[in-house]
Amino acid sequence: MRNASRRRLSLLLLFIFVNCAPSIALGQDRIRIGVPLFPTVSYPVFIAQEKGFFDKNGLKGEIIRINSEPTTYQALISGDIDATSGAPTGLVQSNIQGVPVVSLGSWDNLVSYTMITREKIDDLAQLRGKKVGINRLGGKSSLVLRVMLEDAGLNTSKDVTLLQLGGSQERLAALIRGGIDAAPVDFAFEPKMKQMGFHLVPGRKTPFMNGPITVTVASLKANRGKWLRFVKAYLEATQYMTTNKEGSIEVLKRIVPADDKETLDHAYEQMRARATVDLIPPEAAVENLVKMMTYVDKRAATVDRSKLADYSILRELAQSKAATKK
């Protein structure tokens, strides 16, 4: 009697497992994504999370804000997170050091900074002979600024004076009192800078791979199906972001420290306009990222570009989409 009861219980548990396992497995397929503390560059990740694109593709996303890129890549390599979004410098640095990580795609491929000035100028080249405030030499913002200025034909060692002033509040204070002539600011805060009486330098944005999705090569090989679903969700979120303003701004309110409509509308329109919807960055954007890294490590100049990215999932999804339309 007891053995028969055990057999019936075993059969019941087997029935429950067989019939419920697929949905449980999908629900438990977790992906932990490391993003910056100020994560506008990871915008599609938040949209995928909050608008159900991860759920739709059988994923449970866990977004983790991390305060520096070195810490982000330490977490990626150790397995504490599964992917990074919007942390480009470690992609090159890791490959220089022989650690195989790759980008699966990048939605944002322009520098995220705008130059603000006390006096109105027409382009960055007119900063020749001027003082520019930065956080610190060697920091990411100063390195990106160097790419921007060199793209405009300026030599940062000779043509401008870079002054280390600390954070944004210190740079703004220096601008107000005339201690510097210009400073970089995140594009999301352009309206506030205008309200304060500063001028925004017009002109084209410098190409720069700013928003890569980065994973370890080992994880990509071992979990390709999961990463295919992740990239699909990311593509869908990016498309949603470019076509659904109201829903996208709902998400943006949670990641941009601003509550006024003008700032939020401006930030959204900027991100919509700069989005690379197919996630494949222009060659110039990749080259400027590599160029930036040569400022801190000369070995970056010889890094194998083919090892920085694997777009095979993007190509597979594009082919599948094209076949469906036929």
Report each predicted region and the residues it spans.
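N-terminal secretory signal peptides that target proteins for export/translocation
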Residues: 1-6
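Bacterial N-terminal signal peptides
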Residues: 10-22
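Short, glycine-/small- and polar/acidic-enriched structural segments
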Residues: 27-165, 171-177, 181-187, 199-207
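Predominant activation on well-ordered alpha-helical scaffold segments within soluble catalytic domains
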Residues: 46, 92, 146, 191, ...
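Short linear loop/turn motifs
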Residues: 62, 161-163, 208, 266-272, ...
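Pocket-lining segment of extracytoplasmic ligand-binding domains
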Residues: 89-90, 162, 169-257
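Secondary-structure end/capping motifs
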Residues: 223-301
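Conserved C-terminal helix/tail region of periplasmic/extracytoplasmic solute-binding proteins
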Residues: 290, 294-326
